[in-house]
A protein has these predicted regions:
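Short, small/polar-rich loop/turn modules that mediate ligand/substrate recognition or access, typified
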Residues: 131, 172, 177, 232-234
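Short C-terminal tail/terminal secondary-structure segment
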Residues: 2, 233-255
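Active-site helix of classical SDR
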Residues: 119, 156, 164
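C-terminal helical subdomain
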Residues: 180, 201-232, 239-241
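Conserved glycine-rich cofactor-binding loop
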Residues: 11, 18-20
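Alpha-helical segment proximal to the catalytic Tyr-Lys
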Residues: 124, 169-170, 230
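Substrate-binding pocket helix/loop in short-chain dehydrogenase/reductase
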Residues: 95-96, 103-108, 202
Length: 255
């Protein structure tokens, strides 16, 4: 546990929490004092998460009833649920020209409907806790910038932010805040597979001069889940090393 212990005594559920950014979120919440349950797509993923000290549950967020079952299991184990970090998502590539209905349905079913399912399932417990926190993992893509072959992904991330703003208003008087973290380029196993040269070139496009890590997203989620963020709701917090700023990184050379 860190010295700050932002979420000590709270119980958090992190969907898609067995890998990458999700695992970084789960780890930071745990280090800040929370009891943490994660979900993953396979028994193998969940077994590794349990070895790391997490309660772990197999879940496909497209299944509304399965989401309710996981929440019930978490409450049965820990007694309550205070924090939902809705992180489960996919980011397949496809050009607009080649995109099929199946491609579109898959990404919207997971990134948008799956997010809503997780929030719906968690709401009764979050409201009951009196200090509920919902934090979505969205993206700068679709909200501040765009990339070729990810137009459908960007559309889902913009939709998530629309959900955040309206859900924040709907739940504000019920003691629940709803926010999102919008990551820039974060080093995950998928990105590392692109190779060192690719990562080095990507880092040069970021004013900070380096790529973020899952723990950077996790630390932001831990803050948004804390009492220190009680007056923050309906917001998207960008964590990108200055990536969306208009200044050309080359202009920083020599400074």
């Amino acid at each position: 546990m860190t010295a700050t212990a932002l979420v000590a005594g709270r119980t958090a559920l992190v969907t898609g929490g067995t890998l990458g950014i999700g695992f970084g979120i789960a780890t930071q919440l745990k280090e800040h004092g929370a009891q943490v349950a994660v979900t993953g797509l396979s028994d193998q993923e969940c077994a590794k998460a349990r070895e790391a000290g997490f309660s772990a549950h197999v879940l496909d967020v497209r299944d509304r009833e399965a989401c309710k079952k996981v929440v019930a299991d978490v409450v049965a184990e820990f007694g309550e649920l205070n924090v939902l970090a809705s992180n489960a998502g996919v980011y397949p590539q496809s050009s607009i020209e080649e995109m099929t209905d199946e491609d579109i349905d898959l990404i919207f079913d997971i990134n948008v409907k799956g997010t809503i399912h997780a929030v719906q399932a968690s709401m009764p417990e979050l409201i009951k806790s009196g200090r509920g926190r919902v934090v979505l993992t969205s993206s700068i893509t679709g909200n501040y910038t765009g990339y070729p072959a990810w137009s459908h992904y960007g559309a889902t991330k913009a939709a998530q932010m629309g959900f955040v703003r309206s859900a924040a208003i709907e739940l504000a008087r019920k003691g629940v805040t709803v926010n999102a973290v919008l990551p820039g380029n974060i080093v995950t196993p998928g990105l590392e597979a692109m190779g060192k040269d690719y990562l080095d070139n990507m880092a040069k496009s970021v004013p900070a001069g380096f790529l973020g890590e899952p723990k950077d997203i996790g630390a932001t989620v831990a803050f948004l889940a804390s009492d220190g963020a009680r007056y923050i709701t309906g917001q998207g917090i960008v964590v990108d090393g200055g990536q969306i700023l208009p200044e050309e990184p080359a202009a920083l050379d020599g400074i």
